[in-house]
Amino acid sequence: MIQIDQLRRLLGLFLVAALAPVAHAQDAQVTRMRAALAAPDRPAENKARDADRKPVETMQFLGIKTGNTVVDMIAAGGWFTEVLSAAVGPTGKVYAQNPPFLVQADAEKALLARLGNAEPVHVQLEAAGIVGKADVVVTALNLHDVYNGYGDQPGGESAAVAFLRSIYGALKPGGVLGVIDHVGVTGRDNKSLHRMLPQQARDAITKAGFTIEAESPLLAHSGDDHSKNVFDPAIRGKTDQFVIRARKPR
């Protein structure tokens, strides 16, 4: 008859054997990411942002895996596109979505050619045929503009919910939404500061149909008192940011 101690040892060995492939895959992904982010052809200005943006840790928190299909929603200059490209590896796919007015054609072409596993999207995800096919969609430092309104767009919670619903449609059942944005506080003019209340983001995310799984303090910055515009040289690149991971129901 197997004794309790023997059973515990056997169970421990089983768990080690079962988890070893997962740990190996995670180690390989981290090694690949660090190599890609340190590559000599990566722009120095992008590398300089890594210390504050913690790309490897952020990708791990969002649960992005090798081989995933991911969307960088409103990719702008493509810093996150490059990070996502490294995270999913050569067997994965990155869609760098930008509205036409944000497209920097020459820079985008050079970036995507260098990455090899990414392609541009200059229309809404549904129009591009990205429906129910993404494992993860990340929107970084954009939701505040949708919520606060920009250009001739009125903004408000309804605008944010509609934006997030378009992401919901792009995701597979069980897919992940990652939202990163500048923290705003009550009593400030968050529109002019390019910020939003974390609770505004939470409310819009849940009303769009997602379940919030976790939030991370990875990008919190205590030196930001939330009173300055995020483009103020005193805090640019070092703003206090919230990171939310949410999931589309299976």
Residue ranges, per PLM feature:
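Conserved class I S-adenosyl-L-methionine
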Residues: T66-A76
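Conserved beta-strand signature within the Rossmann-like core of class I S-adenosyl-L-methionine
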Residues: L164, G174-V183
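S-adenosyl-L-methionine
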Residues: V103-V131
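Class I SAM-dependent methyltransferase Rossmann-like catalytic core
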Residues: Q29-K65
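A short acidic, Gly/Pro-enriched loop at the edge of an enzyme's catalytic core
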Residues: N68, L115, A128-L141
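A short glycine-rich, Lys/Arg-flanked "PGG" loop and its adjoining helix->strand segment in the class I
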Residues: S85-A86, P154-P173
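Core SAM-dependent methyltransferase catalytic element
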Residues: A208, D225-R250
